[in-house]
């Protein structure tokens, strides 16, 4: 399985959680039919605006879907956090 560093995790102005990998592009992720999408312009995976799931649920789901696409995404000390509360950051990093 390929690994890639997560360079940024954030919540955008549309209230979608996004995860930005350093190198890997997930242009065909729509084929998984998992509600995880790829933003080809900004180069990140993203969820829909949460309704029944929390941001933590969506984070875990995106990570699993990426692994199903043969890529393990890894948080590093260089990962940037945008519009993420300290509580959510702590939960994600557990």
Please state what every model-predicted region is.
Residues 1-94:
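Accessory DNA-engaging acidic/polar modules
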């Amino acid at each position: 399985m390929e690994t890639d560093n997560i360079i940024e995790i954030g919540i955008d102005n549309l209230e979608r959680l996004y995860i930005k990998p350093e190198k890997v592009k997930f242009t065909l992720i729509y084929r998984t039919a998992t509600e995880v999408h790829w933003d080809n312009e900004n180069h990140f995976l993203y969820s829909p605006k949460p309704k029944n799931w929390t941001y933590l649920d969506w984070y875990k789901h995106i990570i699993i879907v990426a692994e199903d696409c043969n890529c393990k995404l890894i948080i590093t000390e260089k990962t940037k956090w945008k519009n993420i509360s300290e509580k959510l950051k702590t939960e994600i990093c557990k």
